[in-house]
Amino acid sequence: MNRHKDFWQVTEDSLDKSMKAFEIDASMKNELLNLYKVLSPFPEVTEVLKKLKEKNYKLGILSNGTPSLLNELVKSNNLDNIFDDIFSIEEVGIYKPDSKVYDMPIKKYKIQKEEVAFLSANTWDVSGGGNYGYSSIWVNRNNNIFDNLDYKPKNEIKDLKQLLDII
């Protein structure tokens, strides 16, 4: 098959389908899509990232999002001086949980998988990173139950402040 659509196109296609299914006026499409561009971090995130940076941790984003969207979000939230790298699946043309995605930081920094603390609020992301060999941490802000997957995270935290206690 070897077909690939970027995250923005997949999101747009999914939104089109949902809008039709729920009879939402198509004129709202761009307004809804643009909500992705104004996402803000949770209150503690910037403070914790700055503390990690002060401790000389390499900080990165590994996302299915497009580079342009990710860079826009980082810049609009004044985080561009905090992150060392933004890794987008667009570099390898395949979505997580393919191992090529998780290989990107390993290859760039020439580190072992276990040296990466991989955080996500998404259980599928946590499982993918953990099965790859990362030290996965589930950010469970809402006291949810972990999906029935073949992996359980090494750690579970309620917010990023708790991360400072476990690394």
What are these regions (language model features)?
Residues 44-56:
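Catalytic-core regions built around general acid/base machinery
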